[in-house]
Amino acid sequence: MRKILPSKLAFGIFDHLDEDGNAMARQYADRLTLAEACDRLGFYAYHLAEHHFSPHGRSPSPNLFLSSVAQRTRQLRLGPLVMLLSLSHPLRAFEEICMLDHLSGGRAELGIGRGSLPIELGYFGIDPDAVAGRYFEASEILMEAMRGGNLSYRGDHFELNNVPLILRPHQRPHPPTWIATNRPESARWAATNGANVACVGPASLVRRITDAFRSEEGLSSDANCNASFLGLLRMIVVGHSAEHAYSLAAPAFQRWLNNFKFLYDLHAIPVPPNLPLTFDAAIESELCVVGTAAVVRRTLLDQLEEAGANYLLCQVAFGDLPLDASLYTAMTIQSELMDRVG
């Protein structure tokens, strides 16, 4: 595990693996090609979301896909962002993370969360009222399991009796942990517990999260030995000209938006109020950063500074963006940002 705070900006890849219109096998192959390229380019990690029964995510089992990424890369770290602990049995989650950590030679990053859309969990018979409790208990069990030995636990949702924990993670005491949040109180919890945070939203609002994290981190006596990444997520498209970039990004964002809204529309429920419903709104809300290399570099650096973030989560593949476009954006981020300021 990391032992010092990051002194410079770091850069990773975030992916929903949302449906791009191609056959699943083709899309998986394209993403593996992208992951290989990002490994060569020096990105820190590849983070993959978990979604179910929706075109918003073709990776309902992130660890399964990430095991393929692990075999095709050498330095790139990898992990779910987030693994839905409200859905998974914590012992199963523990065993999967141990396997991924060893398959990757100790490169796993562990993002955990409860899930943002109750409908997805409802398909599995999870009562929305039970989600928070299941997540709390599962996260307790998961982190306790990392210690090894025999595990017993009694809660409202899980009961374990002297379970022999044969597996151990490669990284000790456990892989670096992450949460995704837009709430200052969650950021304070992360700082106290040595977790990293990933945020999405306007830089001015994300600043509240990073300030809360740092204020709590300064009070913590035992969490500061591990590096803290304060991540800012952006959907990024770089083109040879502004017109070229916008011609790629606008239709890709629309497809991504349709994928995102699929279950909301199917069940006639309102989408999150902060979701931009047009490409122009996505630019205005800072979710998307699109343009030439110079414009994108300047915009991202300004937003990172305003947000107080030290880790840029680059979503360079979304909707029906062609693989070549994603590769070009990744290469430009490497040359224009990572080489200069990373």
UniProtKB/Swiss-Prot annotation:
State the taxonomy lineage. Bacteria, Pseudomonadati, Pseudomonadota, Alphaproteobacteria, Hyphomicrobiales
PANTHER family to which the protein is assigned, alphabetical: BLR5498 PROTEIN, LUCIFERASE-LIKE MONOOXYGENASE
| Superkingdom of the source species | Bacteria
Record carries keyword Glycoprotein: no
Q: Name one GO cellular component term.
A: cytosol
Ordered alphabetically, the record's keywords are: Monooxygenase, Oxidoreductase, Plasmid
Q: Name one GO molecular function term.
A: monooxygenase activity
- Does this entry carry the keyword Transcription regulation? no
Q: Which Pfam families match?
A: Bac_luciferase
Which organism is the protein's source?
Answer: Sinorhizobium fredii (strain NBRC 101917 / NGR234)
Q: Which family does it belong to?
A: Belongs to the bacterial luciferase oxidoreductase family.
What name goes with this protein? Uncharacterized protein y4wF
